[in-house]
Amino acid sequence: MKKRLFRLGALCCAAAMTITTSAQALSVEEAYDILQRSYVDKLPRAAQDAKSLDELFSYTDDYTYYMTAEKYQAFLQGVEGDVSFAGIGAEITYVPEGIRIVSVLKGGGAEKAGLAAGDIIIAIESESCAPGGAEHRAKLLGEAGTSVTITVRHADGTQADYTVTRALVTQTNTTVSVTGGVGYIDCDSFGTQTGTYFQEGVRGNDSAVHAWIVDLRGNGGGLTSAAVSALGAFSGEGDLIYFVDQDGESTAQSYSGKDLTDKPAIVLMDSGSASASEIFAGGVLGTGSGIVIGTRSYGKGVAQVLYDESNCPYLHGDAVKVTAYRFYCAGGNTTDRIGVVPTLYIPQDQAVAAARLLSGEKTKDSAYLRLVLNGCDFYIDIPAGKESSSAALEAILAALTPDAVLYWGENGGERKLTLAQAREKCGFAASSALDFSDVADSEYAQEIDSLAASRIVFGDGGKFRPDATMTRAEVCALLAQALDLYSTANGYFTDVAKGSWYAPSVNAMAAIGLVSGVGGGKFDPNATMTQEEFITVLGRLVEFVNLDAREFLDKNPLAILQPLPKYKSFSHWAIRSAELLTNSVFDENGDAVNMYCMSLEDIEPQVPILREQAAAALYNALRTTGVLKY
């Protein structure tokens, strides 16, 4: 790649705190030059006319900012792994409303005050900290023993003031333990020593375990090199992460050693798992090294580079952290904004118990259930599971998709079961509470129920209405659910009213380029979407999430595709997406894999798309690209 201006390597971290500022040494013009050369997205024209650093950096993402010399030293301390600092004891990230707590550190003031991951600090000492930025973060550090009063908005919308005592917090970011033949790696962040902890922990204990659980809940990230080293213990050699810069050039970060275990990893994840945690979790899925359970991760799929006096003549003790790359996990998918979708969606109150149930051994003396997930075998001792954690067992069975591969083992033999049969054998209802009452006769019932298990589609009163057409607004809602991406921004379209039920979905999809208007600044949200419109939108989604799709489109311009007879009835703007969905991926026999819900020959491009067709096509696309890994 052209730009290699690293000091610490690519950083994927939510830095914890920083301290008071000093005089600015960097001019707006110099900062603009840095951003022009390395910021991952094209800056708007208005950025050229910025009058201050604050105004200039408002045109970038939350992870791009300027640091004075004092702030830079605090930042360096915060990413070194096992560190000591005087602060409230929380890993944070910036959001428009203020400062979001990604995780609380053990022994810190935030933990003692009862703060939790997902809480948003909206004011510090009664002063608003919206939008979140380094200048607000500085107020959270101070001398040990002093206190700071913060106003916090909780996930349920309530807010309260907390007086938090700053303290020196020493955090060892990774611990490895073995209990009952199960290895448990608890990793709070990816620091300079994390890769070593993983490598030594797995190497030293693998002979004593039959399963590995890796707990990344609340892990806000850290160093990509540490995530790659940790992942390599399970995956072995290969390219484990890809960075793509503003020019579309990509480079891989590889692991060259052998894997240290043949046991699959069970990765625990939640909404506080971000950045390097997502590299690890996505890499486990992409390399077939295990599964991910819990809830969807945070969605920080961008990497930063650090400019300081060692690599930039504009800087003298101060620094600029710049989002310079989007990263793609080992399977070729980005986690940018969409996060990692778990193999099994398990409520957090059952996640650890579910992981331990999945860590069982094949038994001779009692009945067991063997699950084949992402190419790996997992055994559940049924009598022990029902006795120790019936709720977790039920949660696992509720999270499985209709096509799950299941075997019942008993008296030395095995037989294959359907999901409904497995539920009944375990003493639960054959159907899940997530199942729809009106899709049994749909040819796409399996795809619809699979999306429901992954919390991507939701019905109305237990019904899905498979034969109904979809409006443009409804399609945006479906895609927003799939990507877990919504936007409070407004102004993309004059006919998408702020406060309308579909505005967050439409605006989010417009912001990432999945949908566009109909002309005159309008979106026409209530118009029915056609097959070719949905093909176009779905193709853009695949391009957004998958690196291989981007490369395919670069090699297949419209000028080559438009003359093909098979696209005679298509509008020109739908052709590249149609080709991407039907002729870009090939199976082991060399046959094209169709990501859409029907063949090109069966498509009538201008007729409305049905809800069942949209769900099936979305499912096929997410499965083919590896966003969904079962």
Language model segments and positions:
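PDZ/PDZ-like peptide-tail recognition elements
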Residues: D62-S103, T163
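PDZ domains, with a preference for the canonical peptide-binding region formed by the helix
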Residues: I120-T151, Q199, A226, G301-N311, ...
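PDZ/PDZ-like domain segments forming the peptide/carboxylate-binding groove
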Residues: L26, V83-P131, T192
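Interdomain regulatory linker/hinge segments that flank or connect interaction modules
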Residues: S27-E80, T149-T151, A155
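Sec-dependent N-terminal signal peptides of Gram-positive bacterial secreted proteins and lipoproteins
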Residues: K2-A25
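Feature responds to low-complexity, polar/acidic, surface-exposed segments characteristic
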Residues: R4-L5, G409-A445, F458-A473, A480-S505, ...
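PDZ-domain C-terminal substructure recognizer with occasional recognition of PDZ-binding tails
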Residues: R100, E135-V176, T323-A324
